[in-house]
């Protein structure tokens, strides 16, 4: 059984958040929206604030999930991160942009059960 893209994406974000928690990250916010853009996960890794984009794919037949984080998408994430920092986080802090790729390997009763995770820290930088 396959999932519709929205469900797959949501479950991929849940899997990424759980994976980050297991790695010692502290989740600050999920699905932070600014205007029409969104950051999937905002988390602390020790003393670094991480803005995490999650891309989930059922297969890699049409490309690896990391390929979907285009330069345009990076600009949108950076703009949204700046808005978050200005409006909601009023102290100086080290920041970085990460990408988590989730590739589905198995489903059970419509739920993502098996998957591969690839986490790229410092995947891109704000200029």
UniProtKB/Swiss-Prot annotation:
InterPro entries attached to this UniProt entry: Restrct_endonuc-II-like, tRNA_endonuc-like_dom_sf, UPF0102_YraN-like
Pfam families reported in the protein's UniProt record: UPF0102
Organism listed in the record: Prosthecochloris aestuarii (strain DSM 271 / SK 413)
GO molecular function: nucleic acid binding
SUPFAM superfamilies per UniProt: Restriction endonuclease-like
Similarity section: Belongs to the UPF0102 family.
Name of the protein described by the UniProt record: UPF0102 protein Paes_0016
Domain of life: Bacteria
